[in-house]
């Protein structure tokens, strides 16, 4: 039986051909290699039609044009040559579209990304809708690749080299108005008239290319180009620390096309695409993509979720305000905030106002939309308006008695079906639910700060939590735009438990004489977004270290922090960025002065700050403890799978994505190598480095955590 076509042709009475893109059985249009023959058959018909006046590509999907190429095609390639052939086929198809003798217009609504934008770039003109769903970008770099179907050559010529480089190197997505301003699209229209606007453009002569701004024309010349690529190269190297080979190849390929012409540029693009597809970095980044897609589809339990119509939040502090924002503005649910202090409610409301007003200023949101979203949030100092809330998120102080009191009050003032979700970072959920009348409706829902930016949430059922409560909480997290992992109710849960030994070791090296900036730079070089000591300053030294005694009580000496260091720092009123002084000193708010290490820290903790370890040695000590603890978490079923463990570390603490997460990284090194490193470190620095039993056993048997296919677990 022949596969239904993803591309269908309809020639209108006015001799404008409409090519409708609709991949059968899929929510998103993605380009697959087998579609090439369908498009070529259509191109043949178009060339034979002598009456043809123009062509329009449009999607039948409600919220996407083309979301990119099917990534599985790359995974099926066994060699760089095979991946290069794939790129050349894409380039050839786009060239055939571009070579049509009549105007070809892309009518874009929704996501137009990767191969989708490359198809649109191959057209002679582009019209898109003014809808918030409409975004245009080339995100291949986020998978360790570059655009392989002509994007590196067409985009710089259309919008200018410096703007194109910013898009390709970062994977940045543009909204409709931004795309129009830069010349990426020719018109922005309401969705209701998208097709007709594209048809009108197709009836005109081919749109002439917009003259580039003077600055872009200078930068495209030999002298300007040399300066631009040198400057962008240095900036990119600083940002990536040399860990992402795709960025270097993007610069090389774009420059080749500008200096030697498009033919050389296309050759370089296809060759680089093939080579990058085989790099371990790209394989790891693609694995993370597949894993996160799977997690987003995971319902959390077998039970159907309960309806979610409205949410309550207890506490209007930083976390409460952030949770209210994602609940109202991402999930679109009415939110009622309760705080004992009216100022707390005002703080939470201002938090959402600031976020939304920023979007209005950047023209990402209309003022009317801002007001509509803000109207979903209300506040109270008692339980007025809480009677019919489906789920209450508690975000009060980390105090067990207080949280137990919140459970009792919610059970007294809310409906019998209401779920109580605690945003605790350290207290056992079973203890919070200890006196609950309906313990099956109590669960942990651990957000990370800042709530609107951090993609991960941990969902923590205790022994009596019902399957429906789990499913409903997972459903809410997804509505809020989060990636949820379900973890076991053990001290520290997963993320904080693997983070604590990593930070402890950094502080221990500080007491041994390593410099603050050296430790942080070593872990940034390894691939973390910030170093461990800066992270502690950002989180708040008082907040970040609160969990250490909890973990030490639960798991023993391996979690003990260096004696008296934390207390000495806190006694000196150092809380980190929030009060302007921690390990670093921070300039006054609003000023652009950089943070700088406070040399007074060293005598305060009895350290010299001389240093003798290399950057790789510093990183090794911190990271090995994190890996060991992640394996223990898997062994104790704190996490349900290595997939959740990798996603939790990458999305929760910024574990280097190009390494694929702790379990992928262990597999890449080999369990035997990890055990050997840890045994060496245990001999040098103490028993906290003793490899856990599972790692030792896997080392003996030559086992790995992941199977060879991208999405299968062992």
Curated annotation (Swiss-Prot):
Q: Region 3-hydroxyacyl-CoA dehydrogenase: what ranges?
A: 306-714
Primary place of residence? Answer: cytoplasm
Q: According to the UniProt entry, what is the EC number of this protein?
A: 4.2.1.17, 5.1.2.3, 1.1.1.35
| Statement: the UniProt record of this protein carries the keyword NAD | yes
Where is this protein localized, as stated in its record? Cytoplasm
The cysteines joined by S-S bonds are: none
The keyword Transferase is annotated on this UniProt entry: no
Cellular component terms, GO, for this chain's entry? cytoplasm
Query: What subunit structure does UniProt give?
Result: Heterotetramer of two alpha chains (FadJ) and two beta chains (FadI).
Record's protein name: Fatty acid oxidation complex subunit alpha
């Amino acid at each position: 039986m022949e596969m239904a076509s993803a591309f269908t042709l309809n020639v209108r009475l006015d001799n404008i051909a409409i090519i409708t893109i609709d991949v059968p059985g899929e929510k998103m249009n993605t380009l697959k290699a087998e579609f090439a023959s369908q498009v070529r058959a259509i191109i043949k018909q178009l060339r034979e039609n002598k009456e043809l006046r123009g062509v329009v590509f449009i999607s039948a999907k409600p919220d996407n044009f083309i979301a990119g190429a099917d990534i599985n095609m790359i995974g099926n390639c066994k060699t760089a040559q095979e991946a290069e052939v794939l790129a050349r086929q894409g380039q050839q198809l786009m060239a055939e579209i571009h070579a049509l003798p009549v105007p070809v217009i892309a009518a874009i609504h929704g996501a137009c990304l990767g191969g989708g934008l490359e198809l649109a770039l191959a057209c002679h003109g582009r019209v898109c809708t003014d809808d918030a769903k409409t975004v245009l970008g080339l995100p291949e770099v986020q998978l360790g690749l570059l655009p392989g179907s002509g994007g590196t050559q067409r985009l710089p010529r259309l919008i200018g080299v410096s703007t194109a480089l910013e898009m390709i190197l970062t994977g940045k997505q543009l909204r409709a108005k931004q795309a129009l301003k830069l010349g990426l699209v020719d018109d922005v229209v309401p969705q209701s008239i998208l097709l007709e606007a594209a048809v009108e453009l197709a009836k005109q002569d081919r749109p002439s290319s917009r003259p580039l701004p003077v600055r872009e024309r200078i930068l495209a010349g030999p002298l300007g180009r040399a300066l631009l690529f040198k400057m962008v190269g240095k900036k990119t190297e600083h940002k990536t620390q040399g860990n992402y080979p795709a960025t270097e190849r993007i610069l090389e390929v774009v420059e080749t096309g500008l200096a030697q012409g498009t033919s050389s540029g296309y050759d370089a693009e296809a060759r680089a695409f093939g080579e990058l597809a085989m790099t371990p970095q790209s394989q790891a980044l693609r694995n993370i993509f597949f894993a996160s897609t799977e997690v987003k589809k995971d319902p959390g339990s077998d039970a159907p979720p309960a309806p979610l119509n409205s949410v309550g939040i207890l506490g209007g502090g930083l976390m409460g305000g952030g949770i209210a924002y994602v609940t109202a503005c991402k999930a679109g649910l009415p939110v009622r905030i309760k705080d004992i202090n009216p100022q707390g409610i005002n703080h939470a409301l201002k938090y959402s106002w600031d976020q939304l007003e920023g979007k209005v200023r950047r023209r990402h949101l209309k003022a009317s939309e801002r007001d509509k979203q803000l109207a979903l949030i209300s506040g109270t100092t008692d339980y007025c308006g809480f009677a019919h809330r489906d789920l209450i998120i508690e975000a009060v102080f980390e105090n067990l008695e207080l949280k137990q009191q919140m459970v009792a009050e919610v059970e007294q003032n809310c409906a019998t079906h209401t779920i109580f979700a605690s945003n605790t970072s350290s207290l056992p959920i079973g203890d919070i639910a200890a006196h609950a009348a309906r313990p099956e409706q109590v669960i942990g829902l651990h957000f990370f700060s800042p709530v609107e930016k951090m993609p991960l949430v941990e969902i923590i059922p205790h022994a009596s939590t019902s399957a429906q409560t789990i499913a409903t909480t997972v459903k809410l997290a997804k509505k809020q735009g989060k990636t949820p992992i379900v973890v076991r109710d053990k001290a520290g849960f997963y993320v904080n438990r693997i983070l604590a030994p990593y930070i402890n070791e950094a502080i221990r090296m500080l007491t041994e004489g390593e410099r603050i900036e050296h430790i942080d730079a070593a872990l940034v070089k390894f691939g973390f977004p910030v170093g461990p000591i800066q992270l502690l300053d950002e989180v708040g030294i008082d907040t970040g270290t609160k969990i250490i005694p909890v973990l030490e009580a639960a798991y023993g000496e391996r979690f003990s922090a260096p004696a008296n260091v934390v207390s000495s720092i806190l006694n000196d009123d150092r809380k980190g960025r929030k009060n302007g002084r921690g390990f670093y000193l921070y300039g006054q708010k609003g000023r652009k002065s950089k943070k700088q290490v406070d040399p007074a820290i060293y005598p305060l903790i009895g350290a010299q700050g001389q240093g003798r370890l290399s950057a790789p040695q510093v990183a090794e000590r911190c990271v090995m403890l994190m890996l060991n603890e992640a394996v223990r978490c898997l062994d104790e079923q704190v996490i349900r799978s290595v997939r959740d463990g990798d996603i939790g570390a990458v999305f929760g603490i910024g574990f280097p994505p190009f390494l694929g997460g702790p379990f992928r990284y262990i597999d890449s090194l080999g369990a035997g190598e990890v055990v050997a490193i840890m045994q060496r470190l245990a001999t040098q620095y103490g028993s906290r480095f003793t490899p856990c039993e599972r790692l030792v056993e896997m080392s003996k048997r030559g086992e790995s955590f992941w199977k060879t296919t991208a999405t299968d677990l062992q």
